Amino acid sequence: MQTRNTFFWIKEQMTRSISVSIIVYVITQTSISNAYPIFAQQGYENPREATGRIVCANCHLANKPLDIEVPQAVLPDTVFEAVVRIPYDMQLKQVLANGKKGALNVGAVLILPEGFELAPPDRISPEMKEKIGNLSFQSYRPTKKNILVIGPVPGQKYSEITFPILSPDPATKKDVHFLKYPIYVGGNRGRGQIYPDGSKSNNTVYNATAAGIISKIIRKEKGGYEITIADASDGHQVVNIIPPGPELLVSEGESIKLDQPLTSNPNVGGFGQGDAEIVLQDPLRVQGLLFFFASVILAQIFLVLKKKQFEKVQLSEMNF
């Protein structure tokens, strides 16, 4: 009887442990995969400010290049590609939240004109699906289907992101017209330096919050430092906490100034933004243009034939 009770107790404990592990995994993976888009989505109603600045730049302080490629013109109710390229050196490693080094990830926000939206899966061609890979796009807001976000995703695999876009049809959407429209995009590689609440991440430089002499440096067991700065005039002490990740640049007994860097800047990533233009083309206008070209070509042909006929008449008159 006691053996059976022991068996059931062990089985119950193992079940609990497995359940807890699964819950922790799901929570951590969800928070990691959704972290970057959620920061912007929760803090800003619109990712593009009135100045034209995309809000992701508030957390990703370094400026890096970015490129977007879209067709010059598209017809209504057609699927096309918007390709966003986020270039960086694939050999670089970034500081992770735990202070260790790891590969960079990338993310992007694509701001389309009103009426443009993510193409439904049944409208995407097999060739385009192959370019998209396993990426999962989402709308910035349920009411803002024209603003798409993605990331963070592995940068080594997705430094080039293909968005499948469906163009609107003015025949069914009266607020859409055949015009030239702007498209805005922002993209980051690597982690940010500032969180939305204004606090620093461990992926940035830490400066001295007071001037004086470093009286003590304590290396923490889980990484990072605790630096005590003593004011030379009154002996007042200020403690600076450095998280795991940045490398220390100062030592005990060193005299430092206010805002002097205490650590190196470990950031190797950055944010970039760009824009492009696309024309929603009227099919009737295209047909009219083709008809015009055809009429010009026919006119040229008739002109050549008429000229040859006139030359024959002249030649026959001369022979006569």
Swiss-Prot record:
Q: List cellular component terms (GO).
A: chloroplast thylakoid membrane
Note on cofactor: Binds 1 heme group covalently.
The protein in question is named: Cytochrome f
Q: What does this protein do?
A: Component of the cytochrome b6-f complex, which mediates electron transfer between photosystem II (PSII) and photosystem I (PSI), cyclic electron flow around PSI, and state transitions.
> Which parts pass through the membrane?
286-306
Instruction: Give the organism, scientific name.
Output: Buxus microphylla
Keywords from the named record: Chloroplast, Electron transport, Heme, Iron, Membrane, Metal-binding, Photosynthesis, Plastid, Signal, Thylakoid, Transmembrane, Transmembrane helix, Transport
Signal peptide (UniProt feature, chain positions): 1-35
Could you say which residues bind heme here? 36, 56, 59-60
What the entry lists under Gene3D superfamilies is as follows: 2.40.50.100, Cytochrome f large domain (2.60.40.830), Single helix bin (1.20.5.700)
